[in-house]
Amino acid sequence: MKIGTQATSLAVLHNQESHAPQAPIAVRPEPAHAIPEIPLDLAIRPRTRGIHPFLAMTLGDKGCASSSGVSLEDDSHTQVSLSDFSVASRDVNHNNICAGLSTEWLVMSSDGDAESRMDHLDYNGEGQSRGSERHQVYNDALRAALSNDDEAPFFTASTAVIEDAGFSLRREPKTVHASGGSAQLGQTVAHDVAQSGRKHLLSLRFANVQGHAIACSCEGSQFKLFDPNLGEFQSSRSAAPQLIKGLIDHYNSLNYDVACVNEFRVS
């Protein structure tokens, strides 16, 4: 889920991140909802059989931590600086609709430049309302999947928002695990996504079973990645592993340990 922020504050989702970095950010928790302990394998292959539907809905791809007030520079937990790759730093996810915004970014990832895309997706932009509509498709599909006892409701919901945007899946969704650390995870994901002509909706799944949707596109030798909480990043294809590692390290440093990445290749 999205952690809402103001200028220099980072709120804590469901009071689960009380150990989030304290400086230079003041931590203010949102109203807490108790979430029972869930087995980690739900993050790896998100099955919800036996999980209360309300809980499963809270675990969908809605966002997690905003960039507002969060430095993208190197710290003790990361060796890759996201700021080296940032081309349009913007938090457009205050409305908690990361799956919808990421899908909308994929639709127009080849149009204009990074700043114009962020303007499109920002609060006064047409893309914000479209992203909200797309995210409603995601939520509706997730609810339907849960009511039908779907064993992979998050995959079903992601597929629904992809198809609603006019895309189709090029292959079955793929899950890449983080067992080898962020460098290996970044390398493995980049091998799949940083190929010319490929577009992906990606779902970061965290150890607390929360999810966050981002998107990426590779055109020629240029790799572009969009995170609704942080904005747009660009690199060469060869540097894509470092960019993805930097993003993973960013969330790990906020105690959102990335357990796996679900890949949805679209065309």
From Swiss-Prot:
The active site is at C98, H212, D227. Changing H212A: Prevents auto-cleavage and hypersensitive response in infected plants. Autocleaved. This function is essential for myristoylation in infected plant cell and for eliciting the plant hypersensitive response. Myristoylation of 28 kDa product in infected plant cells; it mediates the localization to membranes. It is an enzyme of class 3 (hydrolase). A lipid is attached at G63 (N-myristoyl glycine). The keyword Methyltransferase does not apply. It holds the Pfam family Peptidase_C58. In infected plant cells, the 28 kDa product interacts with PBS1. Belongs to the peptidase C58 family. This is Cysteine protease avirulence protein AvrPphB. The gene is avrPph3.
